[in-house]
Amino acid sequence: MSNFSIPSAHTFLSRFRMPRTLLALVLIFLFASGIANSHAASASVQVFGATGAALPDVAVYAEPLSGPALPKSQKTVDIEQKGRKFLPPMTVIQVGTNISFPNNDTVRHHVYSLSPAKVFDLKLYAGEPENPVNFDKPGTVVIGCNIHDQMVAYIHVVPTPYFARTDTSGKARLDGLAPGKYRLKTWHANLPPAAPIPEQQITLTASDAVTNFTVNMNAR
């Protein structure tokens, strides 16, 4: 076996001949990032439904009660059509996110929504649609196929980057939150139409510890 030695930091950096000013800026950025990460907080959320059972596919999100306005997302995510279903059946995204709707079926689909939060219409197509759809307002968007009525999915658009979807055990975790006060909200497709979105105020401290919260929803 040949000997292998790890070069020193000085040797490694000297190979790139990075200007000292730029190197200093990089080191400052890394140092600041380390501070930010070391003070990030996390919230672990357990959601139970009306029957007392753990509730999957719940949108869980935290809205800061103070601080600067949060930038909109510039991400693109997929909701595919396969087996004449939308997958996943529930998606939670931040305002500003683009969604592409690839059709991986052997038949064409006509994807649309009439929801106030986003009205759009993708005529019959196969494969990749020409352009993704931008979701620029918060709210719940119900999507369907104009050809196959059984195809329904939900998109919950939230005004914060701190969100997750509960797993099969009804659990979700929000990471990277700055210490402070938040409004913790939950949404599920089976909430009664007139029911308010469940919410509670929470406080997260500056530590690496995970704070646990339990939410009970009137949904099945």
Describe the predicted segments one by one.
Residues 10, 30-32, 39:
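N-terminal regions of proteins, emphasizing targeting and processing segments when present
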Residues 39-220:
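Extracytoplasmic copper-binding redox domains, predominantly the cupredoxin/blue-copper superfamily
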Residues 1-18:
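N-terminal secretory signal peptides that target proteins for export/translocation
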Residues 21-34:
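Bacterial N-terminal signal peptides
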Residues 7, 34-36, 100:
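Intrinsic disorder/low-complexity signature
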